From Swiss-Prot:
Protein's recorded name: Ethylene-responsive transcription factor ERF056
Spans annotated as Disordered: 195-224
PROSITE patterns in the cross-refs: AP2_ERF (PS51032)
A GO molecular function held by the record: DNA-binding transcription factor activity
Functional description taken from the UniProt entry: Probably acts as a transcriptional activator. Binds to the GCC-box pathogenesis-related promoter element. May be involved in the regulation of gene expression by stress factors and by components of stress signal transduction pathways.
Amino acid sequence: METASLSFPVPNTSFGVNKSMPLGLNQLTPYQIHQIQNQLNHRRSTISNLSPNRIRMKNLTPSTSKTKNLYRGVRQRHWGKWVAEIRLPKNRTRLWLGTFETAEKAALAYDQAAFQLRGDIAKLNFPNLIHEDMNPLPSSVDTKLQAICKSLRKTEEICSVSDQTKEYSVYSVSDKTELFLPKAELFLPKREHLETNELSNESPRSDETSLLDESQAEYSSSDKTFLDFSDTEFEEIGSFGLRKFPSVEIDWDAISKLANS
């Protein structure tokens, strides 16, 4: 068998001349082979270091991304726990209800708090489960909710009392206006009003005829005074003389006489 041979330049220090001598693979020592392999691996590592490093992104399962905003008053912490909060109706601040292992438990806690604050008007995540037995809220949260409900009831009572006082003031003003009406209109019953209206509707003609008779009697009894237009006034007016002014019209007779002469 023929063995492959490689030629490596071997320096000749004695004469100062480089000579290429044939060197076979079988003549390499194990140390030289190991050194060559290390050089090749080093080149591969330098080439791989030049490329950008791959960063593994955080795996987001579709369940977490969907349930993040699925329930009302529930949000997720970055470490995975679920938090329930509710907005108070008056000052619009958030009341913390606690942290829970699942989103459903947090949603049920929100439903309990919302039902205590708003009653049947509340918008719930699970309206069918509100009357069933649920896990109670923490004691601190429950006491806060009860105090808030009491304050809301007090404000509602104050508002209702103020509305009643307004209505009473309106009624009192209407009663005072009735005092200015005549007594006959205040104390007459409805039947008398109807009878008086019927009588007034039945006898309008008799009243009109009586008024005409009275006016005719007054006219006949009173002295008749007429304007006296005598002729003396017209005679006095006719006695005044008017000044004679020269006529503006052309005298054609005088012009014809002058032309003939």
